[in-house]
Curated annotation (Swiss-Prot):
It is found in: Cell inner membrane. Belongs to the major facilitator superfamily. TCR/Tet family. The chain crosses the membrane at residues 12-32, 49-69, 72-92, 138-158, 165-185, 195-215, 219-239, 267-287, 290-310, 329-351, 393-413, 430-450. PROSITE patterns: MFS. GO terms for molecular function: transmembrane transporter activity. Pfam families: MFS_1. The keyword Kinase does not apply. This is Putative multidrug resistance protein MdtD. InterPro entries: MFS, MFS_dom, MFS_trans_sf, Multi-R_MdtD. Keywords: Cell inner membrane, Cell membrane, Membrane, Transmembrane, Transmembrane helix, Transport. It is a multi-pass membrane protein.
Amino acid sequence: MVTQATSVRWQLWIVAFGFFMQTLDTTIVNTALPSIAASLGENPLRMQSVIVSYVLTVAVMLPASGWLADRIGVKWVFFSAIILFTFGSLMCAQSATLNELILSRVLQGVGDAMMVPVGRLTVMKIVPREQYMAAMAFVTLPGQIGPLVGPALGGFLVEFASWHWIFLINLPVGVIGALATLLLMPNHKMSTRRFDISGFIMLAIGMATLTLALDGHTGLGLSPLAIAGLILCGVIALGSYWWHALGNRFALFSLHLFKNKIYTLGLVGSMSARIGSGMLPFMTPIFLQIGLGFSPFHAGLMMIPMIIGSMGMKRIIVQVVNRFGYRRVLVNATLLLAVVSLSLPLVAIMGWTLLMPVVLFFQGMLNALRFSTMNTLTLKTLPDRLASSGNSLLSMAMQLSMSIGVSTAGILLGTFAHHQVATNTPATHSAFLYSYLCMAIIIALPALIFNRVPPDTGANRHLAR
């Protein structure tokens, strides 16, 4: 007979597999983009839509995931998430055109948007509150392994098999996870308040149209008139949501959140900072392969120091913030990240290849320091009644800003390279240098926002990871 403790451990393993699938897929695709472009007959400098479609879908669908889990039950929502993600992976591998791949990535994104938040919710429901921290540490460990092996595994599969396998490897894991969910996962439900479907649709339209407008000319080849129409539609949709949410206690996100100055400052700073940081995972593998002529596997291996730096920094973030305070940490980490990011193409083009892993290591450290500090600053002063809404809005804003960052990186590369691809040439080096210079400026600008954070010397025992 299976004991309750054993059953809970198996359930935690199911959630952990979901975390692993999500983080692996997030990092494995970037390294493969040039090879996917070659296979589909596309320009590798115009492949940002493959990333944007996925991240934007996650941003749009996140607000609905928690409500669905409470209404339908965590078991069936988590099962559906794994099925959608796995089927989306199969469709990605079967894609013969860029548009087919983009649509398949949207399907993956829907599954991802439900998988991780519902996984966290599942842990909250199946373990006692005093064991929650230990349980989350257990289920997120595979999620930390995913980014570590993702870039190198993606490069290896592309180089020694084909790009299709970066999606096909999700199939056996997905099938096992889905069966285990059916057999072992309890179906916890909770009473729910009315879901703000009108607000959800307005926000979804606003985010989607504005992001598509940003990527419209470079990635989608839209006309100026179509782009203007998308911008107008997005502005109207977001303005309509603001009007809809005024005095509406059932609004998807309460406007009372913005009466909290620290939350508003943290949210704006977090969004602007993640636009710059979102450019890095997209830009770096393309620079290594197109700019320097690295093989996909070599480019994937070069990304590992960045992940190690990020994981290492997470162990000392609390001490750093307690010592220097939020404002000094955020301002200095932001400016240092801009300098370190710009130094990568300079070091590489000058032939100092041995320094590149060091640069990427510090890039990962500074990124992790900013992310965790921003998350905690944004949420730390919210009252309990607004904590859930504020956290959901922050999660959505994080994904949205990352999609904007990838779109911006694609625009910069397309502009400076004039959409012409020639591997490891002076013209290509110049295009990447100009792109990195603009990216460094974008990364540095949020320091102006973070400089407005009030001086803070309070202890922070639990920083958001």
